[in-house]
């Protein structure tokens, strides 16, 4: 059975909130769904806007969409819209690694796809490589209900 994207996003937000709270952050939710961010975090000194994203492990890296897609709307002004200048962090949950990664937007100035390396690249490239372990704030294993029942 194919999972509804909203359900997948809710599971990601839950994993992120658990990891943030365990890491010592205060977590608040904005009212409504018309903000460009999903959460607000409080580190005791300042507040920051966080966009939650589901990452997928592909070719040794956790990859996520670093933009919103509007192509499914009737007459979108733009098919994609990035988050640069509108959030402070991406919080990425990857079910395959159970990792939650908090990535400052200035470390992910990308318009479409974000990426964190889980394994070093085979060509030994070091420049412009972001290692997942440097951004990991916790591990949370949240499986879909049908996976828990079947397993």
Task: Locate the predicted segments by residue.
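Mixed-charge (Asp/Glu-Lys/Arg
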Residues: 1-35, 41-151
